[in-house]
Amino acid sequence: MSRFRRAGPGDVDAIVAMMCGYYQEDGYTFVDSEARTAALMLINDPSLGRLFVACDGAHVVGYVAVALGFSFEYRGREAFVDELLIAESHRGRGLGREALEVAETYCREAGVNALHLEVERHRENALDLYRRRGFADFNRYLMTKWLTPSKTAPRPTAST
C-alpha cells in the first residue's frame, strides 16, 4: 500500500516547511508566500501536473511535485519531477523510490512519454537512486532564463 496520496490545500503548511529547509540546505533564497502560491497552483490546477505527499500516520514526511509539458523530441507529453523531498528522519526507508513510482504511475496514466528531473550535483544518494530507477544523464545542460522579475529566484552559481 502506498504511503503517498494526492496533496490537498491542508498539506501546504507541511510542504512549505519542508521546502524551506531543503532550500536553505542548498543555499537558495526562500520566500514562504511564493512557495505557498506555487503549491496551491499545482494542487488546484490539474492541467499543470500533480503534487503528492508521503505520510507517516497523519504527518506529511515528504512530497513529490510533477509538472506537465510538451516536447517534439519526446513525441508529445513530457513531465518534470520539479521537486522530490523526503524528511531526513524518514530517509533510507524506500520513500524516495516510492515517490518516483508514484510519479511514474501518474505520468503513464496521463499519457506522458518521458519523465525528466534535475538534481544538485552534491546529492550523491539521490543521483544513485535516480540512476537505479532508469534515469540517465543525456550530457546536456539545463539552462534557465527568468521571464518574470524576482529578487528571490534561485540563481546559478559559477561553474569551474
Enumerate the predicted regions with their spans.
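A short beta-loop-alpha structural element at the N-terminal edge
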Residues: 3-17
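Conserved GNAT-fold acetyl-CoA-binding loop/helix
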Residues: 16-41
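Glycine-rich acetyl-CoA-binding "A-motif" of GNAT/NAT acetyltransferases
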Residues: 48, 59-62, 125
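Conserved beta-strand in the GNAT
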Residues: 53, 59-68
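Conserved beta-strand-loop-alpha-helix junction that forms the acyl-donor binding cleft
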Residues: 113-126, 144-149
